[in-house]
Amino acid sequence: LNWGAILKHIIK
């Protein structure tokens, strides 16, 4: 999974 994009989506 692309955690960089996921975390950026969760932590705005």
Curated annotation (Swiss-Prot):
Superkingdom of source: Eukaryota
Subcellular locations according to the entry: Target cell membrane; Secreted
Any idea what job this protein has? Antimicrobial peptide active against Gram-positive bacteria M.luteus (MIC=1.5 uM), B.subtilis (MIC=1.3 uM) and S.aureus (MIC=10.6 uM), against Gram-negative bacteria E.coli (MIC=3.7 uM) and P.aeruginosa (MIC=51.7 uM) as well as against yeast C.albicans (MIC=7.3 uM). Has weak hemolytic activity against human erythrocytes. Probably acts by disrupting membranes of target cells.
Q: Reported effect of changing residue 11 to K?
A: Severe reduction of antimicrobial activity. Loss of hemolytic activity
**Signal peptide range:** none
Q: Can you name the source organism?
A: Panurgus calcaratus (Solitary bee)
> What do the Gene Ontology cellular component annotations say?
extracellular region; membrane; other organism cell membrane
Keyword Transport tagged: no
Give residue numbers for the modification (Lysine amide): 12
Q: What is the effect of changing residue 10 to L?
A: Increased hemolytic activity
Q: What is the effect of changing residue 7 to K?
A: Complete loss or severe reduction of antimicrobial activity. Loss of hemolytic activity
**Altering residue 10 to K: what's the impact?**
Complete loss or severe reduction of antimicrobial activity. Loss of hemolytic activity
Which keywords does this chain's UniProt record carry? Amidation, Antibiotic, Antimicrobial, Cytolysis, Fungicide, Hemolysis, Membrane, Secreted, Target cell membrane, Target membrane
Q: What is the effect of changing residue 6 to A?
A: Complete loss or severe reduction of antimicrobial activity and loss of hemolytic activity
Q: One GO BP annotation here? A: defense response to Gram-positive bacterium
Q: What is this protein called?
A: Panurgin 1
